UniProtKB/Swiss-Prot annotation:
Keywords, alphabetical: Isomerase, tRNA processing
Function of the molecule: Responsible for synthesis of pseudouridine from uracil-13 in transfer RNAs.
Positions of substrate binding: 27, 129, 329
Source organism: Escherichia coli O6:K15:H31 (strain 536 / UPEC)
Full protein name: tRNA pseudouridine synthase D
Pfam families, sorted: TruD
Amino acid sequence: MIEFDNLTYLHGKPQGTGLLKANPEDFVVVEDLGFEPDGEGEHILVRILKNGCNTRFVADALAKFLKIHAREVSFAGQKDKHAVTEQWLCARVPGKEMPDLSAFQLEGCQVLEYARHKRKLRLGALKGNAFTLVLREVSNRDDVEQRLIDICVKGVPNYFGAQRFGIGGSNLQGALRWAQTNTPVRDRNKRSFWLSAARSALFNQIVAERLKKADVNQVVDGDALQLAGRGSWFVATTEELAELQRRVNDKVLMITAALPGSGEWGTQREALAFEQAAVAEETELQTLLVREKVEAARRAMLLYPQQLSWNWWDDVTVEIRFWLPAGSFATSVVRELINTTGDYAHIAE
């Protein structure tokens, strides 16, 4: 299995280094749910600004403040502890009056707004995230500048970031150990993390192999294509290749790669043979996913950061802003720009 740092680059390995997350303020994330609170219902949506706190810790503290069980507080996604982040939490408080959440006190945390809502906020139920990153001690400004220009046109590989695999790859290692036994994993969190790491690693491997081709965005017979921003896909046929290629070039369609699991992967013929060959040696992880009935799915091979802009504060410091859809990783954008240094270079966003 290819280590994250050794995955194929779309724009070639960066020539320079830089410091990511010299302090939390250098990594700002604003969650975009894509909808507004209903204004009524048994749930309360709470928008929180946090610095130096992980999401679960804040959720547990909010539950304690509201005198409800921790499981009654949900969120759409985990946000990094070592960053400044805005995100929504959701507390179920049926039959209770609206509490005064301005009285909620937690170091590094501030309630920005709150309102009633009809539905529970579930994991993954967000549109995306807006990022503002500051890269410091950049050793090669010209290289980073050109890469930013190229990313605007060609995007970046839509890799799952290193944080998906746990500290030191612990989640992937757990999946491999599990794959080698028939012992049930009772811990739901471990089970979820390990299966997710297994499938993500296989996806990354398929994309890395595809990126070795001379023309990464060349549609081949049997490719599974999806409309940009949509989840469903269809299979490319030989007769349609020219027209489909035009639509891929226009970024109307996206070539996808497999998230392997049980059931059909979605590609056919030449494209399916390529994907199967790319992960042919990873039989243990594939068997685990089938055994645990994790359904196969698709994910876009490339990622195009939206609203990408940047501002050089000086020759060694650049502020970069962009928006990514849910499930995408800012660190997968940064790895195409610089070789990152710093203790938190790969921490989750």
